[in-house]
Amino acid sequence: MAIISLAEMMESGVHFGHQTRRWNPRMAPYIYTARNGVHIIDLVKTAQCVETAYRWVRTNAEQGKRFLFVGTKRQAAGIIAEEATRCGSYYINQRWLGGMLTNWATIKGRVDRLKELERMGETGALALRPKKEAAVLRRELERLQKYLGGIKNMRRLPDAVVIIDQKREYNAVQECQKLGIPIVAMLDTNCDPDVVDVPIPGNDDAIRSVKLIVSKLADAIYEARHGAAPVAEEYDYDGAEDEYEDDADEA
């Protein structure tokens, strides 16, 4: 049985790329044509890449490898948290802090601080502090939960990283390259496939497209650890917007 079908990719808008003037020529092998000034991604190539990525991820998950999902754009943030949690992986979905991987010792210190503050809240120790001090500590806790909540149980560097929008998450890509951590990445037509290990060409700006691809990768991890994956819950699209142009230039 195919991992992904052309019909579900069409329905999710996986084939829509960026405006032709904003393309990266290295994505040419994955582009089918251009229509009305917009590149159309070759979904046959995408299906092949999804199949390859699924097998690669599942094989590594079966070997006990741990995955970190990264996607900080609005369209991806909720999906990243939901799918990474579903398959028991780590995630970063707010802001990539410099040195998140290359300076892991320091980041781990902040993660330990997050756990300490959470314990204080759970035991009631936080409420016993003077009002002003407690307020400061709660703000610190909220900030740490926002940026590090998805990796608070990560004891060491991940074995592989799944990235949505290689161009936007450039800093994460660079850190993975420095450390030799394999990258699985969803790439729009403005991205560079040469800087990742397992490319998946597809629309990384449309919510349904991101959901479809990320859920397949999460399925691979879940199935490797638990057997057949449950049907992924329908993502709540209210309040989230598809954006085809704005976010890609922020990296």
From Swiss-Prot:
Position of the signal peptide: none
Coiled coil (residue ranges): none
Domain of life the protein comes from: Bacteria
Pfam family of the protein (one): Ribosomal_S2
Molecular function terms, GO-annotated: structural constituent of ribosome
Gene3D superfamilies: Glucose-6-phosphate isomerase like protein, domain 1, Helix hairpin bin
NCBIfam families: rpsB_bact
Protein's recorded name: Small ribosomal subunit protein uS2
Gene it is expressed from: rpsB
